[in-house]
Amino acid sequence: MTKKLIISYAFSPTNTTTSNVVAKRILNEKNKIDVVCASLDEINKDFTLETYVNEYVEKKYMIPSNFSTEWDNILNFMNEGMKLIKGYSEIYSRANFVHSHFLALEYKLNNPETYWKAEFSDPLIYTFGNRHLSGKLTDEEYISRINKILKEKGRELISSENDINCVCEYLTFIFADEIIFTNESQKDVMMDSLPFKVNIDEKYIFSPHPTLDEKYYQAKKSNYALDKNYINFAYFGVIFPNRSFEDFVNAFENISDKHKDKIRLHLFTPNRTLFEQLLTRDLLEKTTFNQNIDYLEFLNLSTKFDVLIVEDSYTKGHFIKNPYLPSKISDYKGSNTTIWAICEENSEMSKLDIKYKSYINDLSGNVDTLNSIMCEKTNEQKESLTIDENEYQKQRTTHLTQKIAELIDVCESEFKKDEMYLAKINELTSTIENLEKENSEILNSNSWKITKNFRKIGKKFK
């Protein structure tokens, strides 16, 4: 056995963060490999990136499957994968998604001499608000089989009280030969939240998301139009309660008018409606919305903007440390474009060597950073700005309160429409039921039965 196998539930051309990171590792390592993955036909595809990855893929095992994180889907990927793969001296798997680690575990148990590298992108058990990311593992047959192996090794046993993702972390920590984390805080959080005792001190490494060679930034030229009379800022990605983009909005609102007029914001996101509620009217007028784009076009486009914005997730009160290192950072580094990192205090991103860094919920610091960026880009002398933070926060709160009120009005209006539609549906359903009842009464009536022979005669003369 000499060949290496990549086990990745999502893999190029399927367009996900995980499949792109796996593709980047393959392109950086430049070694021939085999791959086993799921088809995931309903997820967007990126065939341009696949063309470059295929240079190193000798054999690809494709398991027909729709995307699902349910146990039946995981089990299917595991069972079907085991029918296809054999003869590998080294395997590599990456989660998210846990399907990959479960299949890798199965192969390792059946081939103990195989070296297994297992990478974790993020903590798998909990997310914000202590919310579980998966359901309970209720497959008693699987639990019983694994527990026999764990008992032989003197390990704690799993049960139907454990989450699927929890079992994935625990078993991977035990049986993998090498554990890969993207950063130290991620490791600390995962070990802290795991309800089992396991020591991985001798087999873990840190490996941040890879940055591709410069040639890949020129592989797919983008024809996206930029007006060089302005300073063009770009943000790629989504927003959610713990990554809100609020700090950029607040900074923009408190810089000088001449700098505001020079800014153009370009958003590549599926969250247009959310951004439209968040942005102020002035900033919204200076913003261009775009859908997500293919990965290689994104790399090329990242070289064309003046500033790339990346923001930490706000994790205080949710984790002992911030375990997340935005994957965009590795791509931005290769672009040679100015990066503005809006960080959480003491996060992994805050420790990186980035010229422009500011911090979440630090209004004066964010304003000062944006002011510095604009002065540098316009070749102007930096001027000090005076901010009445309390007054601004009142204004911003009023603005957001009004937006919330507008959204409530929209929701109530849509709800009333739904009520009207439901009433109409109920009315039509009642009419149909009455017609069916009348029809049934006619068919069962004596007059209908008596005239049966006459109807037959009538058909003959037609």
Locations of the language-model features?
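Nucleotide-activated donor-binding/catalytic signature segment of Leloir-type glycosyltransferases, i.e.
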Residues: 153-155, 260, 269-304
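Short N-terminal targeting/anchoring amphipathic segment
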Residues: 82-100, 112-119
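Boundary detector for helix-to-coil junctions that initiate low-complexity/charged tails
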Residues: 402, 406-462
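Conserved donor-binding/catalytic core segment of Leloir-type glycosyltransferases
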Residues: 225-243
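N-terminal subdomain of nucleotide-sugar transferases
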Residues: 1-57, 178, 255-257
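Acceptor-binding helix/loop patch of EC 2.4 sugar-transfer enzymes
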Residues: 117-163
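Nucleotide-sugar-dependent
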Residues: 243, 308-333, 339-351
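A short, active-site helix/loop in glycosyltransferases that binds the activated sugar's phosphate group
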Residues: 41-47, 159-203
